[in-house]
């Protein structure tokens, strides 16, 4: 098993005809079961055409009706990306994964409010991963997004992170130690995003094929502390935690739009302290994540 996606997932690529969409669709199709998983693309101006055998439809709704796809991945440029997310939500997909970085905050606020209103009115809930995220992978089954597939190995450790490159770092360390991953999830570094650490930790906790988790956060926002407190009360599996930005000065944005210390609780040290209090195995050195996880699961 896995969380969010598996070899039976069927995927629509929104933005399949752009350079980025084409490149990463190619990479995803070439990985594991990708040839069967990526079944449609969307571009209203190119409906009826195809990209390397993948049919292109005018809308997500059409693509879903024709292929039965339940997940979309979005490579649409920032000005149109929020509208692309909403199109996936309106089509009642299970999951929309938005890779795009630099979506205006106002656009994301609008989409989030519309998603909440739809849910409150009894409409289907579509999970959103991202924006500004690397996507998610279930090793040796399917990858949706921009992560390098070859570093992953199938196994029983979950990885969740706000940072794409730190996800890859944790995964590479685990694989080098001979420890495989059940799923790796990049939730993205924007201040307004979909799934949070707490949501992914819940999924890993409930997944019978995940034995332990590496949770990676960064400065800014309350997400990691909220997830740690939830884990203290509910998590049945060992968690290794790392927070990037120990040396970050207050008020300076560090890479991601959401990586900004605006109060004492937003600092790396404050978050690490909460994680330690909540029973996490914490490291201040990212090169130790894999080794600590190995120790935690007793191999």
Language-model segment annotations:
Residues 1-299:
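Catalytic-core regions of core metabolic enzymes
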């Amino acid at each position: 098993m896995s969380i969010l996606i598996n070899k039976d997932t069927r995927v629509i690529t929104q933005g399949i005809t752009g350079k980025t969409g084409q490149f990463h669709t190619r990479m995803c199709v070439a990985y594991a079961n990708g040839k069967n998983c990526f079944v449609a693309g969307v571009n209203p101006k190119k409906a009826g055409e195809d990209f390397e055998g993948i049919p292109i439809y005018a809308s997500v709704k059409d693509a879903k009706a024709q292929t039965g796809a339940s997940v979309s991945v979005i490579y649409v440029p920032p000005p149109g990306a929020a509208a692309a997310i909403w199109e996936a939500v309106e089509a009642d997909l299970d999951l929309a994964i938005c890779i795009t970085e630099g979506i205006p905050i106002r656009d994301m606020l609008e989409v989030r409010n519309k998603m909440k209103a739809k849910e409150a009115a009894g409409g289907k809930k579509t999970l959103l991963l991202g924006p500004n995220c690397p996507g998610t992978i279930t090793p040796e089954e399917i990858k949706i997004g921009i992560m390098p597939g070859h570093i992953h190995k199938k196994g029983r450790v979950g990885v969740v992170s706000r940072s794409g490159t730190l996800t890859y770092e944790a995964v590479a360390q685990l694989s080098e130690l001979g420890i495989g991953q059940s799923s790796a999830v990049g939730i993205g570094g924007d201040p307004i995003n979909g799934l949070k650490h707490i949501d992914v930790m819940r999924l890993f906790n409930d997944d019978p094929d995940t034995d332990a988790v590496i949770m990676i956060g960064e400065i800014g926002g309350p997400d990691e502390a909220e997830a740690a407190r939830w884990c203290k009360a509910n998590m049945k599996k060992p968690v290794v935690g790392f927070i990037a930005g120990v040396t970050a000065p207050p008020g300076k944005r560090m890479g991601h739009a959401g990586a900004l210390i605006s109060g004492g609780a937003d600092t790396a040290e404050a978050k690490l302290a909460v994680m330690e209090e909540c029973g996490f195995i914490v490291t201040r050195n990212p090169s130790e994540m894999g080794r600590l996880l190995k120790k935690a699961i007793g191999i």
